[in-house]
Amino acid sequence: GWEFPPKIYGGLAVASYGITKGLSLQNDVETTFCLPKPTGEEESFLNIIGMNQVPVVWRDVNYDYLKSRLPNYMTPEQYYAFRDHIYADFSYLNVNDLGCMEFAGGYPANLHDEINNFSIIAGVVARQQQFDIIHAHDWLTYPAGVHAKMVSGKPLCIHVHATDFDRSRGKVNPTVYATEKNGMDYADCIMCVSELTRQTVIREYHQDPRKCFAMHNAVYPLSQELLDIPRPEHKKEKVVTFLGRITMQKGPEYFVEAAALVLKRTRNIRFIMAGSGDMLDAMINLAAERGIADRFHFPGFQRGRQVYEAYKNSDVFVMPSVSEPFGIAPLEAMQCGTPSIISKQSGCGEILDKVIKTDYWDIHAMADAIYSICTNPSLFEYLQVEGKKEVDGITWEKVGLRIRALYENVLKNYGK
């Protein structure tokens, strides 16, 4: 995987956590999660391998020095075991005193180099570890998954959390597309976060429908600490929130345009666009152009507890995505008792009924839905109560059982 809590860049970390946690609830499944650059603060229900601690160039390092240099999740014994499985001369690579490659983590400018390095290290890990199946999350780790399959002869499952068709509104990056397609071609099983995404994989990447499965995401039960966040009473003015990356995939301009329509009918609603992204400045300008800047707030990127405070402080949550493979945010908002409006172009709509769905481009329908929830207490209450009930039944434990069943199926038919 590429992301894992507590270091969260987006939905990929949240889903990676949920999937591995769901699998860990079955006593006889053991997961080893390979991450470019762990923080050392990851939870202990799975084994973490920091790819930045796996040597690719032989260095003669003594035990005590290793003890002082390695983090708490890697022992000197493990380091030596990996060192015994270096399979080629990588001395031309840029490595540190332990013969390991450094990772920036996240999504740096040299992302393609990091993806390639991750794949090289996967060759060492796949030679040293004992395992039954490989599960690679999103295109960043597909090359590593393919490499691990070639080295070990073990089956490969890939998990499509998004495709470049979603991220780019159709202006596909050929390098990314080639990486995605290669991963899919080599995969024995392709798990897609929605039927919407599954159809994209079959249609745009020419994959056999028989190896593609929809595997919807879920949500984790809220901790007591998050449950205890108070819900302010908004008697005078209501609050409507967009929370996510402010990029073209997420449709932020439709939120601003819908807000402008709502504010023609009433002034006692405030709109919040929380997040960061390459369209932030354009959205601030658009709100000003529409004459609604005094009713619009841009608090920036929210992390951890702030996200849940934002949900609870909202009377309506809106996700107007142009192309959303799944979209975990509305489920989190509904968990917090916040009625949600989602675009019909969102995968999560396949498993949600107690939400209002509009086309992303239909700003009039979106504005009507926002206005209705804000001015009709019985509609608000219905969506609040029934929405929470619906989402509380969508658990990672159930997802874990379904993934487990797919693993067994793949292993049974592998090589036949």
Label the predicted regions:
Residues 339-342:
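Short hydrophobic beta-strand element within catalytic cores of glycosyltransferases
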Residues 322:
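Aromatic "clamp/platform" in nucleotide-sugar-dependent glycosyltransferases that forms part
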Residues 355-364, 372-377:
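Conserved acidic donor-binding segment of nucleotide-sugar-dependent glycosyltransferases
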Residues 196, 218:
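Carbohydrate-associated surface elements
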Residues 191, 233-259, 384:
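Conserved donor-binding/catalytic core segment of Leloir-type glycosyltransferases
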Residues 301-302, 309-314:
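Short alpha-helical donor nucleotide-sugar binding micro-motif in glycosyltransferases
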Residues 282-302:
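Nucleotide-activated donor-binding/catalytic signature segment of Leloir-type glycosyltransferases, i.e.
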Residues 28-126:
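A conserved catalytic-core segment of Leloir-type glycosyltransferases
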